[in-house]
């Protein structure tokens, strides 16, 4: 069908009708200017916040014919009043560009970047034939890029970065003979790069990275003699780099990383004397690094990582005096590192890990005072560690593991105030570990395991202010543990296994932060200190293969999160305290090869591996196939009951007896009697406690969707599993597999026997609340599938989330993402949480207040999408009238709660702000370094109040050195500070928080296993894109932007 020609007046007619009241008194003055009507059509067609077009108003007095020339974003010609520049960038606009934009016929500059414009790209823009700059980057335009751009014959700059275009790259771009900058990066273009692009003789900048382009690289691109920046990485090309690219004599930046290229590196690239950045990583290049590359005297950044290169580092690299970044990781390179590399005056980053290098490291490495990070792990380096590595006190990451380094650690490292992460395991280092590491205020991670260190473990490790991980296992200390080791303020994981330690285990007083303690395979003796109950966060305790004696402290069973206990291969005696049978968290309890007697506790122990109790001749019970002699053990219990009828004495009772005995001077016989009494009190626990009597009635299942299992299925599954996913203030969560194979999460709310709280439930209130929660449906909310209840217990049935929680991701220490990918994922999680809370606050009737928002209540589904859990559950339980109910968790509770004892939507906003601060800083909501009584909110505000560099607050491991990520983190910091305002009235509603977050959302795209992080055409900084190899530190690679 043939298109009709439509006159401008007819096109504008509907708009005139719409605006008729507006011009009722002003029609003559404004003369219905197409300039005005085109701009007003933009205003009416695009949606955005009120501020977007706040000053785009037409006066009713008719005093200004060209009123639009004073509007924000609009620049007019001084003579004709025609619009020559229109900048609507970063206004949070959405919608589609109206056809009336074509009547801005004098427009030279049009910037629509940083919005959410969508749909096909409007061809009406191609009618703006005078345009010299067109920026549509960071929007959501989709479909194929339409033909017609060649009509913009004066165009110099075209930026379409980060959209959703697909199909082939437009070939008619090649007809833009004045074009200097071309950016089609970050979309989904496919096919080959048009060879005709090689005819753009004035082109200085081309960016096609982050698409799905394929085929061979066009040799004709070598004809772009004015080109300074070529960025075409993260595509799927094949073949080699054309030798014609050596003709790009003005090229400064060249990036073909992650492109599936192969073959040898072209010798001719060594002729690019102006080249400053050369990124060829993650390809299939083979052969040696050409010696001609030593001619690249301007080179600052060189990354050949993750290829199949062989041979050695060219000796001429020692002459690259401007080089700051050298990364050759994961190749087959060998030989020695040229000595001159250590004397490069600007070198800040050296990555050589996972090669076959030999010899010693350059002895002057770091002497330039600028070295910041070095990783030479997984090679065959020998000799000593250079003492000059931290000469400028800027080194923050030093990774040396899996080599053959020998000699002592340089004492200079103990003065390296910048050091954050130090890994030197699996070497041949010897001598004494120098004192001083404990004074390093930034040191968080130290691994010196599997070396030959001797003498004493430095006691000052216990004073290291932020140290979280310390591994000294497999060494030759032959000394006692430092008495103060458990007082380390932030130490979470401590391993000194198989290190020839002797003596007794120090008392556990002060053991507040430890998650894992590994002391197996030593020669420790004495008893296990009873005050291990101080280790409140302990998950894993391994004291196996030592010479420990005495009884097993019942205090271990009271640790709220303890999961793995290994006391095997010792000389322990007595019985296993019955308290362990009621533990809800223990999944492993290995006491094999000891001298234990008596019954194995029932309860949760019934599902443990029988081998955990082997080689204890005196143990009895079903697990070891030996029936217990009830008369023998009952007699023993009766004897104890005669002395302690009212309640079994705990450790403190035994301690009192010891004190009294010493005080009155009664000697040996009284001590024996007290000891016997104390040991018998442990035996009494075999038959005591932990049993719930009485009839609790039948189970009832209330389902909120169709379920393929029954209440009995749930109860039976829980009776057979000890797979605890978590435990909190409201109950314990189990992973349960139903008979049909479906996996769900079951939250058993605390009953009346939880500690001494004597919690009771209001039956009707519970059911009413559950009914409200069961009807919540949102993609960012964990779905409540149903509820099982009886007279004494309530269990909530949720969909199972396989990827753990945000707390695991932030603080679990298992980094499986790159820095850029992790930040992007965390930002998306933050948005997901905001969307979920926004739904609860603004779309539910009645409004649902979460009451306990924290990272452990934010779960991650199979796609790492955030799902808010435990919303409203805190209202389902209450304590006796004499007990006070604390709504929320320490560190996340809004300050006004202290005097109002009320929780509302603003309380959730505060908790959400704390979560954002945890994401930004990498720290927990409460840490010792914040000072007594202070939270992360106080700490951040104190840092900003003292005018410390805001970047010092940002998490180093999250890529804060990357300009784009750094600015995004600062933006999130501003939002977090708003949310954690002391006054509730100053906190924005979650709807506004969500809007701000979405406006500042980072533009990232994933292709395969790679995250594309590419910057704006006008941004000449660099992004760090980090990859993780199993067992390695984060490896940073860079993508120029």
From Swiss-Prot:
UniProt-reported outcome of changing residue 210 to A: Reduced interaction with CLE41 peptide leading to desorganized vascular tissues
Enzyme class name: transferase
Membrane topology, record value: Single-pass type I membrane protein
Membrane spanning residue stretches: 653-673
Site (CLE peptide binding): 210, 255, 353
Residues modified by glycosylation: 78, 92, 111, 258, 271, 322, 332, 356, 378, 430, 442, 471, 525, 542, 590
Coiled-coil regions listed: none
Swiss-Prot/TrEMBL LRR repeat ranges: 80-104, 105-128, 130-152, 154-176, 177-199, 200-224, 225-248, 250-272, 273-296, 297-319, 321-344, 345-368, 369-392, 394-416, 418-439, 440-464, 466-488, 511-535, 536-558, 559-583, 585-607
Positions that bind ATP: 725-733, 747
GO cellular component, one term: plasma membrane
Modified residues (Phosphotyrosine): 798, 839, 892, 899
Secretion signal, residue range per the UniProt entry: 1-29
Cytoplasmic side: 674-1041
Pfam families from the UniProt entry: LRR_1, LRR_14, LRR_8, LRRNT_2, Pkinase
Cystine pairs: 69-76, 390-416, 511-535, 620-628
Function, as annotated: Acts with CLE41p and CLE44p peptides as a ligand-receptor pair in a signal transduction pathway involved in the regulation of procambium maintenance and polarity during vascular-tissue development. Mediates repression of tracheary element differentiation and the promotion of procambial cells formation and polar division adjacent to phloem cells in the veins.
Family: Belongs to the protein kinase superfamily. Ser/Thr protein kinase family.
Name this polypeptide is given: Leucine-rich repeat receptor-like protein kinase TDR
Species of the source: Arabidopsis thaliana
Name of the gene encoding the protein in the UniProt record: TDR
